[in-house]
Design a protein with these regions (language model features):
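Alpha-helical transmembrane segments of multi-pass integral membrane proteins
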Residues: 115-136, 158-176, 192-206, 252
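Membrane-water interface signatures at transmembrane helix termini and the short loops
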Residues: 185-224
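Hydrophobic, membrane-inserted alpha-helices
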Residues: 12-18, 67-76, 98, 191-200
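Short, hydrophobic transmembrane alpha-helix segments
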Residues: 17-29
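Short aromatic-rich membrane-water interface segments that cap or initiate transmembrane helices
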Residues: 147-161
Length: 267
C-alpha cells in the first residue's frame, strides 16, 4: 500500500464514522465538506501550471498566458453553444488527466503510454458515472441548463464503457508487469487502490465519493510531485515557500469559481 492509498483509507474511515454517528449527511453538508476540501487542496494542485510548464518548455511568459487564456476562452464559447458535446469532451480530457497523474509514480517509457493513461482514466470516470447514475440524473434536475446531461448518465454506453475499461485495465496492469514497467507488488497495490476507489464510489454519495478521490489521491499526489520537482530545480524551496507559490493562482481560481457558481445559482 502506497502512502496515498493509506491516506485515502483513513479518509474513508473518517467518513464512515461520521455516517455512523449522524446517519445520513444532507446535501448542503455534503457540499460544504466537499467544497472546503477542494478549496484547501483540490484547486491549489493546479496552481503551478505556469512554473512547471515554463521550466520544461522554451516559451515566454506572455505566450504561455495568452495560449492558456485563449484555450479557456475557446472552451467557454464551445460550452455556451454546444454544452452537451463540450461536457463529453471535458469528461474525456479529465479522464486522460487523471490517468496521466495516477501513473506519474512510474517510469512508463513506451509509445503506448498515453493509451494506458486514457484507459485508466476512463475506468475511473465510467465507474463514477455508472455507480451513481440515479443520483446524477436527480442532481441534473436542479438546474435548467444541466437537465440535458441526464441522457449521458442514463445511456447504456456508460455501462459498456465501465465493463470494457475494467477489462482493459486488468490487461494493462498484467502487460506493465510483464514488461517490467511495474513490479508485482506495484500491481497488487494498484488493484487495492482500485478496490478502495470503487467501494468509495459505490457506498458514498457522488459528491463525497469523488471529493475523497480528487483530494486525497489525485491532488495530494500532484502536490507531492510538484514539490519534489521544484526542489530539484530550485535550491531554496521548502514547505512554506511552496505554499507561497500556490497562493496567487489559487486566489485567481477561487475568484473565477465563485463567479461561475454565482452565475449558475442565479440563472
Amino acid at each position: 500500500m502506497n502512502v496515498f492509498s493509506f491516506i485515502y483509507l483513513i479518509s474513508i474511515f473518517v467518513i464512515f464514522n461520521i455516517y455512523a454517528a449522524f446517519g445520513e449527511i444532507d446535501f448542503k453538508t455534503q457540499v460544504l465538506i466537499s467544497s472546503s476540501l477542494i478549496i484547501l487542496f483540490g484547486i491549489p494542485h493546479g496552481s503551478l501550471d505556469n512554473i512547471l510548464f515554463l521550466s520544461k518548455n522554451k516559451i515566454s511568459v506572455f505566450s504561455f498566458y495568452f495560449i492558456y487564456l485563449l484555450i479557456a476562452f475557446i472552451y467557454l464559447i464551445a460550452w455556451i453553444w454546444w454544452p452537451y458535446h463540450s461536457f463529453i469532451l471535458f469528461l474525456i480530457i479529465s479522464a486522460y488527466h487523471f490517468g496521466e497523474s495516477h501513473f506519474s509514480d512510474y517510469k512508463l517509457d513506451f509509445k503506448a503510454k498515453n493509451f494506458v493513461f486514457i484507459v485508466w482514466g476512463l475506468f475511473l470516470m465510467s465507474s463514477l458515472l455508472y455507480l451513481n447514475s440515479s443520483e446524477l440524473i436527480k442532481t441534473t434536475q436542479f438546474f435548467f441548463d444541466t437537465k440535458q446531461f441526464s441522457s449521458i448518465y442514463s445511456d447504456k454506453i456508460i455501462s459498456y464503457l465501465f465493463h470494457a475499461s475494467l477489462f482493459l485495465t486488468i490487461v494493462m496492469l498484467a502487460f506493465l508487469v510483464y514488461k517490467k514497467f511495474i513490479s508485482t507488488e506495484d500491481m497488487f497495490s494498484e488493484i487495492f487502490q482500485y478496490f478502495l476507489i470503487f467501494i468509495t464510489f459505490y457506498l458514498f454519495p457522488i459528491i463525497i465519493g469523488f471529493t475523497l478521490y480528487f483530494v486525497f489521491i489525485h491532488s495530494f499526489r500532484s502536490l507531492y510531485h510538484e514539490f519534489m520537482y521544484l526542489k530539484k530545480i530550485k535550491k531554496n524551496i521548502n514547505f512554506f515557500s511552496f505554499i507561497k507559490l500556490l497562493i496567487p493562482h489559487s486566489i485567481a481560481a477561487y475568484f473565477f469559481t465563485f463567479l461561475i457558481c454565482y452565475a449558475s445559482f442565479n440563472n
